[in-house]
Regions:
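Metal-dependent phosphohydrolase cores
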Residues: 1-137
Length: 137
């Protein structure tokens, strides 16, 4: 998926936003706050996946609208919930020294990077709407 084609914000693509986060991640590593290569790789994956749920047609229409449009809870699923469906478990498993819980850790970081909703409750109660939103991709 070419994330340069999708917008995270009106003035920034998802890929540009990811690149910004990765720059900050490098700063944290350089400063010694991330001293484990495994942790660095897990956070890097979380940075990559955290906003991919914004690729939906509804989000893209909203972010590019000339006049401010608000999130429609009847039609949309928060992007942090949708993003977790894109996390690739195989990528997590490729990390040297990975732990079987690492996939869940990355998913948790992605799901809870905003507090728009209770992600688990949303997943359990809005499965049909999640499928509709993901079908737009």
């Amino acid at each position: 998926m070419n994330l340069e084609r999708y917008w995270a914000k009106p003035d920034k693509t998802i890929q540009q936003h990811i690149n910004d986060l990765l720059t900050h991640l490098e700063t944290l590593k350089t400063m010694g706050y991330i001293d484990s290569d495994d942790l660095y790789e897990l956070v890097k994956l979380a940075c990559y996946y955290h906003d991919i749920g914004k690729v939906t047609e509804r989000f893209q229409q909203r972010v590019l609208a000339k006049e401010k449009q608000y999130f429609d809870p009847d039609r949309e699923i928060p992007h942090n919930v949708l993003s977790v469906y894109f996390v690739n478990e195989n990528q997590v498993q490729k990390i040297k020294g990975h732990d079987k819980r690492d996939y869940a850790r990355v998913c948790f970081a992605v799901m809870y990077h905003h507090d728009y909703c209770d992600p688990i409750k949303t997943i359990l109660e809005r499965e049909d709407r999640i499928k509709e939103n993901l079908a737009e991709v």
